[in-house]
Amino acid sequence: MAATMALVDNVDEQHALERLLEESKPPVPAAASRLHWLLSTPFRYPPPPGGSRFRGPDDPGVFYGADEIRTACAELGYWRWRHLLDTPALAAMPTRPQTVFRTALSVACVDLRTPPFAAERAVWTHPSDYSGCQRLGRVAREARVGAIRYESVRDPGRGGCCAVLTPAAFARKAPVEQQTWMLSVSRDQIVWQRTAAVRQTELAFAPAIWGHGAGRAPSARRVRR
């Protein structure tokens, strides 16, 4: 709501603007209506052209998460950097606050890092061809598998990630914990910073870790602030 306050003169106008914005958005699916907006948002919006790793262009929503903060920061940082590359007029993106949060799941899942799935590791970790992963996502839904655990492609440490295929997978209606981090993105560096009490934590990524061309997908994934 802070972003809309800058566009109006008072709180009443802000509330009116927020209502108009909410009415213009796609409806929240009934299955996700009980959830906090941080959890329901991925199920609310259509995918980008070409889809995402486990979501085809015509598939239902997928919530993407990671086991560790560093892995989540690498994944999101990559896509923000990709957006910057697709905007030639910008040398850097303004530093913005980001909400990093933890949630709990209770659902049947498959782990692509274990047999027999591990034999197809090259398919699951391809930097730009998502066709095999999207087919698996559809098969998993048909088998009533609620989540897919897999190896991060953007984290140099290859941390664990999870694609949540259904809103029913969440054990709680809201995040368990939230933190605010500041994200700065330039063409040669992605930096995350968090200051808590007297301690500052920083995570930095150089685009070189993603290789030549950074594994460009069919289209840039839209990332929500």
Predicted ranges, named:
Residues 61-65:
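A short, exposed loop/beta-hairpin motif centered on an aromatic-Gly-Thr core
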Residues 71-77:
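Contiguous mid-protein beta-loop-alpha structural module that forms a pocket-lining wall or clamp
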Residues 1-56, 78-81, 85-225:
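Active-site and NAD+-binding cores of ADP-ribose-processing enzymes
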